């Protein structure tokens, strides 16, 4: 049996299901490229049959990613598998992942079927997927609540049909680690052809046991772990990949397995996922939380100063979290900024140096010194907002006080035209938003507003993340500035640009559909 554990990332499929606003194709690609740098073996990036947007995302990522295998999800339905294959065919290497429920409860109440019918359907669909690729994964949905004898029958049949990976999900996060290990061991004992496939696990955190269950399964013989960065996902989330990866690295003495992950990319990938998905990382989150390597106890601090290994089982550097430096000021040139980005591991293709340097100079004039986390924040925001903008914040001014009604005046560039409006509001941010809404006449409803500090002290950058509802769809916007009202305004303008771009995409899709329809009529 191989000692390498395959890392299967589902941040962009199962993880995205938990988000309040869907990610754009560009945002998904940004995360996919980060996962590729981190070295994930397989990335599941969508459910193509679910929507044209998901199909486009899968196809775009499949075209761009070269060093990881790209995977798409499909139910045991002919159309699902055919559409998944169509979206993936541009990839260097791809996998089709198909699934069907196997537990008595799901078979009886959801599928209204029988186990024999489920097995027959699984065989047919695995064979159909094999017509497109020799890499087919089959999942037994709700395997954690499936009797072992039934599960063994399904697994044996799927392998005989051509499945090369068999996934055993704890779909509702119900099993205990010793139970889950028993399921994996039981399959090895009962399935005669199990050596012809890789056994995978997909766990959920409803009882806080997703990572524990995955590691127990690895110890019992599983050689693929599925999960999401930062553990994002439906309900209580998925298995946190960064936790499993580092547990395998730190406790190699017991597990005796390894991964092909570039550990130096873990922290940066985690931060990127957090920012793009608008899901802050708790300070006490294992591996990537801001307190993961902090020591406040005097006894602990003394021990760490004498020898870090007294209280640290891994180092910040082992996940790519290096010490903050204070070496850039308004007198630093473009070469210095580029050199620092190089040192932090960023490639030039990941940011626009001209835009970054302009933003850096403006910030350096305000703050004096610019930190690494400032540069990363500027690069991230620049990447998010580098697409052509229809709306641009030209000017704003607010007046408010403890006994005054907040008033805002806003100038907004709308295409080639600059428009101005003033409005009152419940505080300066609300006043700015009311003025922006008057200018655009978009009936935007604010669903979520969050503010986080990027840096330390009074000169920290304020990052505002908002989720807004427009015509039944949710859009995410982000803004960054030393002034909170300014970053709030920028976040709303980002939302408006996302709404405008979505409308333009919809117009283009309608135009293409009409063009195709006209061609059919001509023929």
Swiss-Prot record:
Residues 5-267 form the Pyruvate carboxyltransferase domain. GO terms for molecular function: 2-isopropylmalate synthase activity; acetyl-CoA C-acetyltransferase activity; manganese ion binding. Mn(2+) binds at residues 14, 202, 204, 238. Keywords: Amino-acid biosynthesis, Branched-chain amino acid biosynthesis, Cytoplasm, Leucine biosynthesis, Manganese, Metal-binding, Transferase. SMART domains: LeuA_dimer. Residues 392-523 are annotated as: Regulatory domain. One of its GO terms (cellular component) is cytosol. GO terms for biological process: L-leucine biosynthetic process. Its EC number is 2.3.3.13. Its main location: cytoplasm. Catalyzes the condensation of the acetyl group of acetyl-CoA with 3-methyl-2-oxobutanoate (2-ketoisovalerate) to form 3-carboxy-3-hydroxy-4-methylpentanoate (2-isopropylmalate). Belongs to the alpha-IPM synthase/homocitrate synthase family. LeuA type 1 subfamily. Homodimer. PANTHER family: 2-ISOPROPYLMALATE SYNTHASE 1, CHLOROPLASTIC-RELATED, HOMOCITRATE SYNTHASE-RELATED. This is 2-isopropylmalate synthase. It comes from Escherichia coli (strain K12).
